[in-house]
């Protein structure tokens, strides 16, 4: 039955978008109960609850930070909430302790589905949840943009919509170059309502975060974009910006993947970001609404990023919930709170389309996680298919909202042909997952693309290092040659002077 729906979805998707609302109607006709494309409660008042603290936190840290000696704690150290565990390193932001307690251990671990090594700092909670001394900034207009950006950097804030790019780095590149700020509150992926809940509960704080960004970037136009289905969130924001001239509130259709930054810019401004360029080159900067909220907390409250709002969804056995959870909370703790059986469930980190399936329940909540789905093992049809050979049906090409050729990218990514994948613009892939959903051969296309992107970035970094050290070597060689030539000239001049003296004598 699901196979038949997959073929129907090819015709549902036309050129640019996958119409989720129509797709859900098709699913309801065929009565597929265990499909993951589920209805959002976008017209309901979303409540926000706080998750109780676990006994142990598992805070994941990029292994590059350890290699550069940026770790600030050792085994046995006592820490407070908000205390720096690791210093920032290039585009990698600082990591802070999610609670007060003691460092039990620091271990290296390979995260299989992320295909990367991480250091895990294990923090044992003392139950008191004591903060470090915080220094809120009430009048941020007395500070320069550079100082505020530096504070955001040390507060550990990054893109909370999934990109994970350093917020401060993005701000540094944008100062003096952009004229419009876009606050992205479009959650087009089914089941994910964390941003919707954040707006309904913290609209004033979000507006304050926008004002901070206006001061840093020195811009006069700000667009807050909301999906047309989020009626309550739109009305709440409308009341908050009613007397603010620089703010404009817009609605967009709930068509996946309209929440993607590249696609949203195309919808709002009818512009496409050129190959190898960024939105900043068009005079536009975009931030997720959760990132804006985190900026407000960092500047006005003096709180680094130690928690975030995520959506928990488990279909029949767990109604949709939005919870405020600490970074580093193990998923096993969430399952224990809501009495979910680990033996009968799988965990999907992220939404139903772009999420990653994991099997280790000790995996912890990351800063970039906005949704955790609990999927029944018996009814999980989406992950029970085996990968088969590509039949070149071109369903993925018809479905791609970025007008790429996923079929060609698949072949070249599979054989690690980096030159060809770059020619076919793999960097423009927004990883929406539509091509994977419509593929009749059940090929995990996103896995191939993510791995290829990572290999390309590693290769580029290696080439950069080679060129850098080659230039340093050439400069050193030039300095030595200059030094030798100066020595020779000195010896020759001394010899000539000595001969002249002897001749006079």
Curated annotation (Swiss-Prot):
Part of a membrane-bound complex that couples electron transfer with translocation of ions across the membrane. Its EC number is 7.-.-.-. [4Fe-4S] cluster 2 binds at residues 400, 429, 432, 435. SUPFAM superfamilies: alpha-helical ferredoxin (SSF46548), Nqo1 FMN-binding domain-like (SSF142019). Its cofactor is [4Fe-4S] cluster. GO terms for molecular function: 4 iron, 4 sulfur cluster binding; electron transfer activity; metal ion binding. This is Ion-translocating oxidoreductase complex subunit C. It comes from Buchnera aphidicola subsp. Baizongia pistaciae (strain Bp). Gene3D superfamilies: 3.30.70.20, NADH-ubiquinone oxidoreductase 51kDa subunit. Keywords: 4Fe-4S, Cell inner membrane, Cell membrane, Electron transport, Iron, Iron-sulfur, Membrane, Metal-binding, Repeat, Translocase, Transport. Disulfide bonds: none annotated. The complex is composed of six subunits: RnfA, RnfB, RnfC, RnfD, RnfE and RnfG. Residues 381-410, 420-449 form the 4Fe-4S ferredoxin-type domain. GO terms for biological process: electron transport chain.
């Amino acid at each position: 039955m699901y196979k038949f729906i997959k073929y129907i979805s090819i015709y549902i998707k036309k050129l640019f978008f996958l119409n989720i609302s129509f797709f859900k109607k098709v699913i309801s006709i065929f009565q597929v109960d265990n499909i993951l494309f589920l209805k959002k409660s976008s017209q309901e008042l979303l409540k926000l609850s706080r998750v109780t603290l676990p006994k142990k936190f598992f805070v994941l840290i990029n292994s590059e930070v350890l290699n550069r000696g940026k770790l600030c704690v050792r085994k046995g150290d006592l820490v407070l909430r908000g205390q720096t565990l690791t210093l920032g390193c290039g585009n990698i932001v600082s990591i802070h302790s999610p609670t007060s307690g003691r460092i039990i251990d620091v271990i290296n671990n390979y995260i299989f589905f992320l295909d990367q090594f991480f250091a895990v700092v294990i923090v044992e909670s003392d139950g008191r949840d004591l903060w470090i001394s915080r220094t809120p900034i009430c009048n941020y207009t007395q500070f320069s943009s550079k100082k505020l950006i530096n504070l955001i950097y040390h507060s550990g804030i990054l893109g909370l919509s999934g990109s994970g790019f350093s917020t401060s780095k993005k701000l540094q590149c944008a100062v003096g170059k952009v004229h419009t700020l876009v606050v992205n509150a479009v959650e087009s992926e089914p089941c994910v309502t964390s941003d919707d809940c954040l707006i309904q509960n913290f609209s004033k704080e979000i507006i304050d975060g926008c004002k901070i960004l206006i001061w840093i970037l020195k811009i006069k136009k700000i667009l807050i974009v909301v999906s047309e289905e989020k009626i309550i969130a739109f009305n709440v924001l409308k009341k908050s910006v009613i007397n603010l001239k620089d703010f404009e509130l817009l609605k967009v259709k709930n068509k996946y993947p309209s929440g993607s930054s590249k696609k949203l810019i195309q919808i709002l401004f009818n512009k496409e970001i050129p190959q190898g360029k960024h939105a900043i080159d068009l005079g536009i900067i975009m931030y997720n609404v959760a990132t804006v909220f985190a900026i407000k907390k960092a500047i006005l409250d003096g709180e680094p990023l130690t928690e975030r709002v995520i959506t928990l969804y488990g279909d029949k056995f767990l109604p949709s919930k939005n919870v405020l959870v600490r970074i580093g909370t193990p998923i096993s703790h969430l399952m224990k709170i809501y009495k979910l059986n680990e033996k009968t469930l799988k965990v999907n980190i992220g939404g139903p389309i772009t999420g990653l399936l994991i099997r280790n329940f000790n995996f912890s909540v990351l800063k970039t996680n906005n949704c955790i789905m609990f999927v029944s093992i018996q009814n999980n049809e989406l992950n029970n298919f085996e990968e088969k050979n590509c039949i070149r049906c071109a369903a993925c090409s018809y479905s791609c909202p970025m007008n790429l050729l996923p079929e060609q990218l698949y072949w070249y990514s599979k054989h690690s042909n980096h030159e060809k994948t770059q020619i076919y613009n793999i960097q423009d892939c927004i990883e929406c997952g539509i091509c994977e959903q419509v593929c009749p051969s059940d090929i995990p296309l996103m896995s191939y693309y993510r791995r290829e992107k990572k290999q390309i970035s590693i290769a580029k970094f290696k080439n950069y290092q080679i060129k850098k050290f080659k230039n340093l070597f050439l400069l050193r060689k030039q300095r030595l040659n200059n030094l030798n030539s100066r020595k020779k000239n000195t010896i020759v001049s001394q010899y000539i002077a000595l001969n002249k003296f002897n001749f006079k004598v």
